[in-house]
Each structure stands twice: as C-alpha cells, then as structure tokens.
A protein has these predicted regions:
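Carbohydrate-interacting regions of secretory-pathway proteins
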Residues: 23-320
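Bacterial N-terminal signal peptides
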Residues: 8-16
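Bacterial N-terminal signal peptides that target proteins for export
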Residues: 1-9
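Sec/Tat signal peptide C-region and signal peptidase I cleavage site
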Residues: 17-21
Length: 320
C-alpha cells in the first residue's frame, strides 16, 4: 500500500510536467508578429522563444530600436504569458497569447492590468533557398534625374528627399540643439525577393540613415556614437556589428554590395567582407512589416538627420 501511495503523486507530477512541456513546446521558435492598436496602423514586431533546463527564454524586436531579451515567460492554463519589461511610464508590458493551431498566435498586449493592442503572429518562414546559378544584368533603381520609381513614406508632409546632381539626397541638415527627427523615409515602388544590390552612400559626421532590405532588415548607415558596434556603419542593425577595427569613414563615398538570398545575406563594403552569408534571425527595428515570406521594397531612412547622399543604385535578380 505504501508503494502505491508514493507512486501516485510521482506519476501525477510526471504527467503534469509532460503536459506543461508539451504546452510550452508549441510556442517555441521564431514568430513574425503584428500589433494592432485601437487607433492607428498595425505595426510589426518579432519574437524568438527557446527552452533551456525547463525555462522559457527569448528575445523580442520591438517596433523601433534594437532587440532585447524578455524578462520572463510561462505557460498558464494553456496561454503563453511573456513579460517584456516596463515601458517608459513604468507599467509592466506583457503579451498574453494562445496558439489555436496551424502555427499561429493570437492575443493581447497588456500594460499593467489594462488590455492594449491585439496581437497576431505566424511562425517565421525558414526561407532556406539555394544560391541562384545566374543573375540578371544590373539595372538602375535610380536614374539620377528624378524620383521616378521611389515614393516617400512615413511623415510624407515633411519629405526632404530630392534628386540632385545625379544623387538621391535627404536634404535634412542637422541643426544644433535639435534632433531633426520626423522627416520622411523613401522606398522603391517595386518589390524584390532575392537580389544583388549595389549602392553608394556619403554620410556626413553625425548623420544617421539606413538601407532596409525587403523593407525589413536594416544595413546601418552612419553612427550612433560608437557605444554599440552593432549600431555603427555597416552593421546589420543590432544583429551583427561590422568587422573589428572597421572605420565609419563618414563624409566620404563608400559602396555596399549586398547579396540577399532567403534569410542569408552577404555584405561587402568597398570590396571588404563585412558579413559573409550570415543568417538574418528576423526583422530589425523600423521594418515596414513582418511578412518575411513576401517580397519587399528597398527603403532608405530619412527620419533622422544629416544630408545623406546616395548614388549608383543598381540591382540584379535571379534569372528565371
């Protein structure tokens, strides 16, 4: 009898642990998230969850800025509760999510005890594609004469982009004492999947811009003060820093040659390897959307400051 009495609780604990592990497992992996506030437009975020020693760990890429680690996560009554940490107001932000099946998430973002935006997520696609055998001849995305094929986005009423002297220029000079944020970005009207991009840029001292691949992955242009290498010239923003010892060389023309196939990107700057077929885990801050399986435009960041100049923008795509 004693053996049976001892065995029953042990068996119950084992069953509960197994169920909890199964409940957690369906939430693990990378998720492309869309956040829909009560007013305003939906915007993208991204999340990755892993499990280590029975503990859920992870990271989140918010709407802007760099990714950060979550402060905790647990599965409660079949729901995933992700603690994102406090917002500026001090309220704790949590995501409460369910997984109804088919690799999707639904839920709500809570600020303290108050329900906020609704959440929807899909499993991030693998995007595992082989390198194309042949590419098309490079063609210009900017003719140097006008903005045909490009359109401002964001704060379009404060568009500073002009075509001047064969260059695509964000004419938004830095004013001492002002952040000069709020000008428009600009994107191509055409969308692309896999490609080879050539682009040249001249970023002044103190300038800040970015080249967004498929509108989702930022190749950093300029500097954010040198404190974080992954925020400096040539970084895949917040994911991969430039090579050790790389110089920003602001105020000079520099070229980028970018090959993006699936989720893997190679970046050369002035012919020097910066990123060799590295995996892009997910969108960076400032992405237009989180629809990673879809083609997307190029977009150039203009909502910071500095007279950023681009030229000689060409693209090749896989031959069909």
């Amino acid at each position: 009898m004693k053996k049976k009495i001892l065995f029953a609780p042990i068996l119950a604990v084992a069953l509960v642990s197994t169920v909890a592990a199964q409940d957690a497992k369906k939430f693990l992996g990378r998720w492309d998230m869309t956040v829909t506030p009560a007013t305003g437009q939906p915007y993208p975020q991204w999340m990755e969850l892993t499990e280590s020693a029975g503990k859920i760990e992870g990271k989140v890429q918010p709407r802007g800025g760099a990714w950060h680690a979550i402060t905790g996560a647990s599965v409660e009554a079949g729901k995933l509760v992700v603690d994102l940490g406090p917002e500026r107001s001090g309220s704790e932000v949590t995501w409460v999510l369910t997984e109804p099946g088919s690799g999707k998430l639904t839920g709500v973002e809570k600020h303290g005890d108050t329900d906020g935006p609704t959440l929807a997520g899909v499993k991030a696609p693998l995007l595992d594609r082989p390198m194309p055998k042949e590419w098309t001849k490079p063609r210009a995305l900017f003719d140097g004469k006008d903005l045909k094929g490009w359109e401002p986005i964001g704060n379009v009423e404060n568009n500073k982009w002009v075509a001047r002297d064969g260059e695509l220029v964000n004419d938004n000079p830095e004013v001492p004492g002002q952040k000069n944020h709020g000008a428009a970005n600009i994107k191509t009207t055409e969308k692309f999947q896999d490609f080879k991009l050539h682009i040249e840029v001249n970023c002044p001292e103190g300038g800040n811009s970015g080249i967004y691949l498929r509108g989702r992955y930022e190749l950093q242009v300029g500097t954010e003060g040198g404190k974080l290498p992954s925020h400096e010239m040539g970084a895949i923003y917040s994911w991969y820093p430039p090579p050790a010892g790389a110089k920003n060389d602001l105020g000079k023309w520099t070229s980028y040659d970018v090959t993006l196939v699936g989720r893997h990107v190679t970046v050369l700057r002035d012919g020097k390897m910066y990123h060799d077929n590295v995996e892009l885990p997910g969108p960076t801050g400032g992405a237009l959307d989180s629809n990673e399986a879809e083609p997307g435009p190029f977009y150039l960041q203009g909502d910071h400051h500095g007279v950023i100049r681009y030229r000689n923008i060409t693209i090749s795509v896989p031959k069909k």
